[in-house]
Amino acid sequence: MSFYTGRYVRSHGSTWNSFPLRVGEMTLGDHLRPLGVRTVLCGKTHMRADLEGMERLGIDPTGGIGALVAECGFEVWDRNDGVVPDGAAKNPSQYNRHLSAQGYEGANPWHDWANSAEGESGEIKSGWLIENNHLPARIAEEDSETPYTTSRAIEFITQNTQDSWCLHLSYIKPHWPYIVPEPYASMYGPEDVPPPIRSEDERSKASPILAAHHAKRSAQFFAREKLREKAIPAYMGLIKQIDDQLGRVYDALKETGQWEDTLIVFTS
């Protein structure tokens, strides 16, 4: 939310995932819209609307300006924040519906295909488990999250060649679950992972914040060399996939005559 508002967390109040952004906070879209610039979302935000505040002010979150306020000032082209692993979301994402339409079976193809591998006996091996991260995702590469999001972004770019626009292309990867389809699953191995730089003082003299981080399960997992050697090569493959997909975006901008007029800003 700090990217979208230009304000510190303590100022805008959205301190963690799923904490609503207060209604009334000015976002990128609020500044660009009066200039005639469409501000469009394709991908992930983790934004949670301040429905209580909107109700208090009589703002309908489903239409007009209320729909923009409920989506952090963005016009939603395609939003994908991922799905919990134990079943379909109450409101399935466009991506999950796309996978179902492509013939991927199950109530939650986001998890069962895009973010899981397949065991020797055909069982689903969840990508949420680091011990499975070295395995290739079950899904065809072209149907995985990063190419899908890229294709949706290209649809917007090619359909809006005459408009002034700001496209927030927000890839959900590389992010948990750390799993990627072939050919990226095999591109990197343990030999490509730089050794960690560690000091015993980091543990014995850790600040309260660092000590709390050390106590987290994820930190304990990544302290184990065997798990690092499975997760980090997959993470590197996910980054390489984004590199390749950005090439498709650049080609679309060039083919539609918008390359010289487009400012590309990377954030992470």
Could you tell me what each predicted segment is?
Residues 1-268:
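Formylglycine-dependent sulfatase
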